[in-house]
Amino acid sequence: MANAYKQAGVDIEAGYEAVSRMKKHVQTTMRKEVLGGLGGFGGMFDLSKFALEEPVLVSGTDGVGTKLMLAFMADKHDTIGIDAVAMCVNDIVVQGAEPLFFLDYIACGKAEPSKIENIVKGISEGCRQAGCALIGGETAEMPGMYSTEEYDLAGFTVGIVDKKKIVTGEKIEAGHVLIGLASSGIHSNGYSLVRKVLLEDGELSLDRIYGRLELPLGEELLKPTKIYVKPILELLKKYEVYGMAHITGGGFIENIPRMLPEEIGAEIELGSWEIQPIFSLLQEVGKLEEKEMFNIFNMGIGMVVAVKEEDAKDVVRLLEEQGETARIIGRTVQGAGVTFNGGTAL
């Protein structure tokens, strides 16, 4: 049967076109250590030039979750790849690792070349922001598994750090200062609740501006996750950082303790940073309790670093010079868990 595979729903020619269109974006991410080009069976990266005493590779993998459904609804696909990169590289930089390379996995119902190109364009932008090379990936056309408009997106990154410079959090003591780096918005966690609260129950429109939002709701919800790699690596060159937490699913309450020793807790000062209007809208429309908000969302802080009190102001200044909005948001205390001072934040 001629064109049997195409009749089964897999268009090989469209796949070839998608690869051809993405190459110019991938090329912008290349580093001198990358060996070979796009299209090989495996991506190669030369580690021989890294002058580290005890080099340690650090890996991370993640996806974008149901934020993808907002991209489908808005038919906007050129930034969701930034989210995929951010979720991976932010996870490994908290251990002090410099991201080296990234690989993506796209599974779709129909490999529409322009859509795949836009997804990879976003992935490439994320890689440039993180300073890592996009050295490979897989686009799997899977009719029957996904509708023609649907796709899933995941990624994998590898970074490197000298063993003696790994940031573990084990030396954090009571009295260390916690500095928060502002998020761009919701980032990539909690979107199942976001959709239920705002779109299903609240029946809000993606095209309208609500409350104190500055953008239509759809644009606000699709703001890409902030990538903190470059400012954090710059910080690590100049100051001792005792611990870091990427504030993802589980919010403050689950993620900050991940960097703390068992006997140390965190005391957060509400009102010490600006919480974006999207979180107020979510709480108001969904009638959500403040504690629940802090247990699900980043609440305006995407990364937390722990430093000595005498370094705190200088660290804030350095991060601000790197283009970040940084605030002292609390300190570590004897005890366990996360407590909040200062009343209502929203």
UniProtKB/Swiss-Prot annotation:
Pathway: Purine metabolism; IMP biosynthesis via de novo pathway; 5-amino-1-(5-phospho-D-ribosyl)imidazole from N(2)-formyl-N(1)-(5-phospho-D-ribosyl)glycinamide: step 2/2. It catalyses: 2-formamido-N(1)-(5-O-phospho-beta-D-ribosyl)acetamidine + ATP = 5-amino-1-(5-phospho-beta-D-ribosyl)imidazole + ADP + phosphate + H(+). InterPro entries: PurM-like_C_dom (IPR010918), PurM-like_C_sf (IPR036676), PurM-like_N (IPR016188), PurM-like_N_sf (IPR036921), PurM_cligase (IPR004733). One of its GO terms (molecular function) is phosphoribosylformylglycinamidine cyclo-ligase activity. The keyword Cytoplasm applies. Its EC number is 6.3.3.1. This is Phosphoribosylformylglycinamidine cyclo-ligase. It comes from Bacillus cereus (strain Q1). The gene is purM.
